[in-house]
Amino acid sequence: MNKKSLWKLILILAIPCIIGFMPAPAGLSELAWVLFGIYLAAIVGLVIKPFPEPVVLLIAVAASMVVVGNLSGGEFKTTAVLSGYSSGTTWLVFSAFTLSAAFVTTGLGKRIAYLLIGKIGSTTLGLGYVTVFLDLVLAPATPSNTARAGGIVLPIINSVAVALGSEPEKSPRRVGHYLMMSIYMVTKTTSYMFFTAMAGNILALKMINDILHLQISWGGWALAAGLPGIIMLLVTPLVIYTMYPPEIKKVDNKTIAKAGLAELGPMKIREKMLLGVFVLALLGWIFSKSLGVDESTVAIVVMATMLLL
């Protein structure tokens, strides 16, 4: 551990300690007040990152278990801290995060992008629809729209814009402005189309269960959001193209796609395996009721399989 990480760790540890020595506000128990301090420290830890995010969260969980065991007076068991992990929804999102990381690590996300550019990216309007199809393909397995748009889609589309002579400070209206607007608006749409497309959907599903007492499956969510989502995805690039027309109309997409695919090389065995797992995961989530298998079971199988790649 270097000195910088050590100071970050000291700051994180100081937060719950300081809050713990302060009197609890009216209406809050001492336990709730200390847990708030741990929660706040975890958020700060995720921002300043003295360690990778999983390590920060594991430390927060461990600290919470120690506090609950000593301050609850027997009202709560330490296992209550882990109760959220018994939810099938949680494991569904975990598995989707695993898949999203695999898309980045294996390069399959990039390969899909360049294939789409080669097929339908001969015009700037076509490039707008490349962002649609790419985001739509990745959305079911990427429960972070920031990771999806910023980690996979944006770097590729940005490199295309730069290759076409469009840079943020010099010539954004050449093509870059249109493409960036397309990415932003498209990812907002795909985020609500699938339950596993955005982490915030977990909260929405819980509110639906609590208020309306409805149990919505992965397939049910996708079916309900599918029609409005598809309409929005078909219209969005065209509307942006009309409102912010790019200066470039034609694109040498074949050259861009060929160069990108050449850099990636032939499709590797890990990419093929990931593609197979991804398709099977989607089929499992969509037809879980017909197959008599719980969605969380499919999620855990997916996670276990991903560890083998």
PLM ranges: what are they?
Residues M1-M22, N145-A149, L164-I269, M273:
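Juxtamembrane and boundary regions of transmembrane helices in multi-pass small-molecule transporters
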Residues I10-I18, L40-I43, A62, F94, ...:
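Generic alpha-helical transmembrane segments of integral inner-membrane proteins
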